[in-house]
Amino acid sequence: LTETLPNHAKPLLVLKIDVDTYRGTREGVGHLVRMIGARQGRATFLFSLGPDHTGWALRRALRPGFFSKVSRTSVVEHYGLKTLMYGTLLPGPDIGKDCAAEMRAVRDAGFECGIHTWDHVLWQDNVARRGADWTVKMMRKAAARYAQVFGVAPRTHGAAGWQMNGAAFIEHDTAGYAYASDGRCVLKENGTLANPADGPHRLSVAGKALKCIQMPTTLPTLDEVLGCEIDGSTITAANIAAFLLRLTEGATRDHVYTLHAELEGQKLAPIFEQLLAGWQAQGYQLASMADYHAKLAAVADTLPLCPMTWGELPGRSGQLMVQAPAAA
């Protein structure tokens, strides 16, 4: 069902699926495979391959903005109390060891798979301030485990929490990744692109142009807008699909949407069903990152070169990788 390549005449809606936790891998992933497969869609699943230490993330509670997000999205409801104890009151399960069969089932269903991270919380909370040795060691641990699970080397990556550093981007070239999705396009408060021309680009790190094509997320995530007041209306489970579909109406460009196995694959699945139906009705092809890369082949040499940059996004606490204006 997923062997036919997409019709590139249609704009692509790239489904980039971040799988952060043991529970998400065990339960959410299978739901997403069925939902997307039922629509003959394609997608890329990015797996966390080492220990689930989600409980460590509670330290982020000290960060400004964290509590407003938690109260909006009900972390316990979506992640489950047990998951929030991993690494604190309970030992963190080893996702790549315990869920290898679930991961291979995604590949066997015809979906692209790639790396999210080794240890989601460890990476997200540390990589911005760590050096090359720590960074490369973590990435190679994830790559080795991926090869163990799938029997082949990984081909792509999407960073946990959109957190990276220069050494991590350089490691993509060393690993031979042709494309990745590690950052975000800057968004306005209403979810629209601050720079409508943003999209696929290459990065310049420490003055060196890298080969790996970055395909940044162009749309807000559900947890960034759920419960927020935007243009005078509160975004709720009842109207969030319509809100996101307004951002893609007209189907004038390709989009990358990041979803989470723990959200869209579980409690928020009914919203995701509305989005899938809506995007297909708008004329989009539900696509994988590999599909997008294939579509970009003709223009790969003309993509802008942008410096590595940090920034903030509405509805998300802290700094993350964002697309900067192209280098002059």
Where would I find each of the regions flagged by the language model?
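Catalytic alpha-helical scaffold of carbohydrate-active enzymes acting on polysaccharides/glycoconjugates
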Residues: 1-156, 161-212, 236-257, 264-328
